[in-house]
Amino acid sequence: MKSGFVSIIGRTNAGKSTLINSLLEEKIALVSHKQNATRRKIKAIVMHEKNQIIFIDTPGLHESGATLNQLLVQSAIKSIGDCDVILFVASVFDSTKDYENFLSLNPQVPHIIALNKVDLTDNATLLKKLSEYAKFSQHFKAIIPYSSKKKSYKKGLLDEIVKYLDEHEYFYDPEFLSASSEKELYRDFILESIYENLSDELPYSSEVLINRTKDTPNLLILEANIITDTNSHKGMLIGKEGATLKRIGKDARFKISKLAQKKVLLKLFVTVKKNWQKDEEFLKKLLNDEN
């Protein structure tokens, strides 16, 4: 029996959250084409044979001067030292530059490269990319081609990860899908629904805070505040006669209901907090895993 923690590291939009969902065969990590959709570290528990792997989905690594993005990157870098194995996720279409930047952080724990999205390319392109990574072979333990859309890739990746975990009793109940709080997951589902319903920069000026939860045997009641930075953005979130907010609520309610396995009553409110993305105290509270 082995058990351990694996930090998933990589550039924004490398497919980290989609990879976690494919390993779980459940939707639990926020997925969006928008940069840095993942704002908090999600811990997802995958049982593989008799072994327990706890994946930590971190914010994407990238360069930015914005306060929020700096804190996201700090969170990702910190997780490098708080795990047993690092899984570096890279798209087969990306250059090795991001991996070289990762190596410059001097990771002290073993790492594996998951070369993602291989279902979207041909063998010649895959082999070329593998040869590009080969010059770094003294640094990584293995490089594994992966596709989140095909279950056949799952076992090979998990087998490789388990090799580098220590013998240890389970850290969590094997029946759990995630060590992250349900409140945190519900919050991310609402945020994802904002991403899906509003384009361009508006979602980046928005955040979600859960104000109240009440869980009964047949009904989950949630009240949440969508925080945004201007009155004009508030108007866009609400939409004409509340249509946009209703659509966001409907989409989020469906996702939460699927996870909670019960009917959900979701009440959404929109609040303006100017310059919240530059308020370090507010952001640190927001990004705190225990919040």
Curated annotation (Swiss-Prot):
Single GO term (MF): GTPase activity
Occurrences of domain KH type-2 (ranges): 186-274
Predominant location category: cytoplasm
Span list, region G1: 10-17
Annotated coiled-coil segments of the chain: none
Entry-linked Pfam families: KH_2 (PF07650), MMR_HSR1 (PF01926)
Residue span of region G5: 146-148
Entry binding sites for GTP: 10-17, 57-61, 116-119
Keyword set, alphabetical order: Cell inner membrane, Cell membrane, Cytoplasm, GTP-binding, Membrane, Nucleotide-binding, Ribosome biogenesis, RNA-binding, rRNA-binding
Tagged with keyword Cytoplasm: yes
Region (G2): 36-40
Era-type G domain residues: 2-167
Membrane topology category: Peripheral membrane protein
Disulphide linkage map: none
Gene3D superfamilies, per database record: 3.30.300.20, P-loop containing nucleotide triphosphate hydrolases (3.40.50.300)
Keyword GTP-binding appears in the UniProt entry: yes
Function: An essential GTPase that binds both GDP and GTP, with rapid nucleotide exchange. Plays a role in 16S rRNA processing and 30S ribosomal subunit biogenesis and possibly also in cell cycle regulation and energy metabolism.
Subunit structure: Monomer.
PANTHER family recorded: GTPASE ERA (PTHR42698), GTPASE ERA, MITOCHONDRIAL (PTHR42698:SF1)
Similarity annotation: Belongs to the TRAFAC class TrmE-Era-EngA-EngB-Septin-like GTPase superfamily. Era GTPase family.
Name of the protein in its database record: GTPase Era
Organism encoding this protein: Campylobacter jejuni subsp. jejuni serotype O:23/36 (strain 81-176)
Lineage, uppermost ranks: Bacteria, Pseudomonadati, Campylobacterota, Epsilonproteobacteria, Campylobacterales
